[in-house]
């Protein structure tokens, strides 16, 4: 009999990833009521209502300029790729079961969102407003939200307390907006006690954001202008597992001696920065991306989380450093790979130079 061993970190990645990649059908199967027969099967003429999926309404890619009246039976509403500018209360009067709204790629502005219309959708779990014309995070929001996607808008402001009641939110995506450091205050993310993924990539940040929720597992800060990691910054987010800081302005001087020596971090991405040496890492780290920096040499003795002698004595089954993937291309390093790297990181499966 063959025994399959699953790496704990890969299992964690699978579990975290599954939270955000469930299909609509899977969510439907979990939440589907036992009987839909008491609802009439009306369908707006602009939309498509699949008989096999009676609580879904597909109005995407129809050139719509306004939201049609939503039947009471609908849980999943697809309105992406239209010309919609406003979200008013009238179309949602009967839509008391809505769980999922996709309004990506429209022309919605903050002024176009009627006051209180979103917060009245008491059962809404997933709200997609990517690729619109928003200049601030809309408020108030439904208190039961689990995912809020606001990428690729023009957001430069986050109203005070807008997230304070969103205790169930697990994912917040604000990437590719116009956020400055001043938009992220110490209490901006207060109340997001369940948050697992925070994406603030492709904004205009120069500093690490303040007061990241303590339960955050994935933090994406790529494509900003961050220069410094504050001392003990990650002690406030002790569960962070995946950290992306690619395409910033980090230098050796901007990283404290043990800035990334945090036991929870399994995947660390620092590509396209200004580093000349490899920063200290923890023994649990499995993936390290340092490509396209200014690194000229690699000293395994210096970067090994344990002494080389100890690593050599541990052997294959010992408590050795867990690094499996190391990317160093785009630097000034020439092959071959130093022997002390291989002695220290005995689980390495790939080194890209």
Swiss-Prot record:
Domain LRRNT: 34-72
InterPro entries in UniProt: Leu-rich_rpt (IPR001611), Leu-rich_rpt_typical-subtyp (IPR003591), LRR_dom_sf (IPR032675), LRRNT (IPR000372), SLRP (IPR050333)
Keyword Electron transport in record: no
Annotated Pfam families: LRR_6, LRR_8, LRRNT
SS bond partners: 43-49, 47-59, 304-344
UniProt keywords, alphabetically: Disulfide bond, Extracellular matrix, Glycoprotein, Leucine-rich repeat, Proteoglycan, Repeat, Secreted, Signal
CC annotations in GO: extracellular space
Tissue expression profile of the protein: Cornea.
Positions annotated with a glycan in the UniProt record: 94, 168, 223, 261, 299
Record-given protein name: Keratocan
Species this chain originates from: Coturnix japonica
Phylogenetic placement of the source organism: Eukaryota, Metazoa, Chordata, Craniata, Vertebrata
């Amino acid at each position: 009999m063959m025994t399959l061993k699953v790496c704990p970190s890969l299992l964690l990645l699978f579990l975290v990833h599954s939270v955000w990649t469930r299909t609509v059908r899977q969510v439907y199967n979990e939440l589907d009521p036992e009987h839909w027969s008491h609802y009439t099967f009306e369908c707006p003429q602009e939309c498509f209502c699949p008989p096999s999926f009676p609580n879904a309404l597909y109005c995407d890619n129809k050139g719509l300029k306004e939201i049609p009246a939503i039947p009471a039976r609908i849980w999943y509403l697809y309105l992406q790729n239209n010309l919609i500018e406003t979200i008013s209360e009238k179309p949602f009067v009967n839509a008391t079961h809505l769980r999922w709204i996709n309004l990506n790629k429209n022309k919605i502005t903050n002024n176009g969102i009627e006051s209180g219309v979103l917060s009245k959708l008491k059962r809404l779990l997933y709200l997609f407003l990517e690729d619109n014309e928003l200049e601030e995070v809309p408020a108030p929001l439904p208190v039961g939200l689990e995912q809020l996607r606001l990428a690729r808008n023009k957001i430069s402001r986050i109203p005070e307390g807008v997230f304070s009641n969103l205790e169930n939110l697990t994912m917040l995506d604000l990437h590719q907006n116009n956020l400055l450091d001043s938009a992220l205050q110490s209490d901006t993310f207060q109340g997001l006690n369940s948050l697992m993924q925070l994406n603030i990539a492709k904004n205009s940040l120069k500093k690490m954001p303040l007061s990241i929720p303590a339960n955050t597992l994935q933090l994406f800060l790529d494509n900003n202008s961050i220069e410094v990691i504050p001392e003990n910054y990650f002690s406030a987010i002790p569960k962070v597992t995946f950290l992306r800081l690619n395409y910033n302005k980090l230098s050796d001087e901007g990283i404290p001696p043990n800035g990334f020596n945090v036991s929870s971090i399994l995947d660390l991405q620092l590509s396209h920065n200004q580093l000349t040496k490899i920063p200290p890492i923890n023994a649990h780290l499995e993936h390290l991306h340092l490509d396209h920096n200014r690194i000229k040499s690699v000293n395994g003795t210096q970067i090994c989380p344990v002494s080389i002698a100890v690593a050599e004595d541990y052997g294959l089954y010992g408590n050795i450093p867990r690094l499996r993937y190391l990317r160093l291309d785009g630097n000034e390093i020439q092959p071959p790979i130093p022997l002390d790297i291989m002695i220290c990181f005995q689980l390495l499966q790939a080194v890209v130079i």
